[in-house]
Regions:
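An acidic/histidine-cluster motif and surrounding catalytic segment
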Residues: 1-101, 105-282
Length: 282
């Protein structure tokens, strides 16, 4: 991102926060990218969370209980970093929700919004736990608010309610202050204790792709996924917001269908209609 003129759309993200941005110590260029975005969008309410790097470090010292065997070291680092961010949020803020963000989140698409963050928050479902704001989907992307599909991937950015963060910290964090705790990942998270499953599958999660991810930064954990899944979702969403953003009715966009994707198909043949003898005949 280069230095640009004053952002005339900065008001759209007024009230967007507190933000807890997860960043590896060994990737300062990503943190510079995020700080430039925050400055451009006039966002002040953010903090950097130093991430655990499971790719190069042995994280067995911070994992309590059985060490997960069905996820990669990088995925363990990602999951524990998100839990660390939640613990820090609860320890240092009394805000009713927090925005968890990874260091490849892209805010540029906000310029296509014809609404603002306060409008979006006003339409959150009454019983929400998590709202996923950035999506990488292996199928068709549903652009309106919806109950999260299992193939709506990415923890690049999501909003988490305080009570759900408290639940996850209670289940998975052990010890005292932020940075000193250990983590339990053997609590039966299905299908695996990766960040997506641990955060989203443990509560009432909705998804709406209001933000994006910086495709040029690649992926620290799954670089092989960029060309397979990330590129397609990114291109489709960018075109959608560029072409359709100015005409969106946010009230309609946030009015989710509670039955979407939640009705089982009938695979058994329908029953034969019952027949009755004509009146007067046996």
């Amino acid at each position: 991102m280069t230095i640009r003129d004053k952002n005339k759309s900065a008001h759209k993200l007024r009230g967007f926060g507190p933000i807890y941005c997860i960043n590896l110590d060994g990737q300062p260029e990503r943190w510079e990218y995020m700080k430039e975005q925050f400055d451009y969008w006039e966002i002040k309410n953010y903090e950097r969370i130093s991430a655990y790097d499971g790719r190069d470090d042995d994280l067995s010292g911070i994992v309590k209980g059985l060490y997960p065997t069905n996820i990669t070291p990088g995925e363990i680092g990602c999951t524990t970093s998100h839990l660390k961010a939640m613990k820090h949020y609860l320890d240092t803020s009394d805000a009713p929700y927090a925005i968890m963000m990874e260091d490849d989140c892209d805010l540029d698409v906000v310029r296509f919004w014809n609404f603002n963050w306060i409008d979006v928050y006003a339409y959150f479902p009454y019983d929400w736990d998590v709202i996923q704001l950035a999506i990488i989907c292996t199928g068709d992307i549903h652009v309106k608010l919806h109950k999260r599909f299992v193939n709506d991937f990415s923890t690049a950015c999501y909003v988490i309610s305080r009570h759900h963060a408290e639940k996850l910290v209670r289940l998975h964090c052990r010890g005292g202050y932020t940075g000193k705790q250990t983590y339990k990942l053997d609590q039966g998270v299905k299908p695996r204790p990766v960040a997506d499953d641990l955060v989203y599958n443990s509560g009432n999660t909705f998804s709406i792709p209001l933000l994006m991810y910086k495709i040029e930064l690649g992926s620290s954990i799954h670089p092989e996924h960029i060309g397979v899944w990330h590129n397609g979702s990114h291109k489709a969403l960018w075109q959608y917001w560029q072409q359709m953003g100015s005409g969106i009715n946010i009230a309609d966009h946030m009015n989710y269908d509670p039955y979407l994707g939640r009705v089982t198909e009938a695979t058994a043949p329908p029953p034969e209609p019952e027949t009755y003898p004509e009146e007067g005949k046996v």
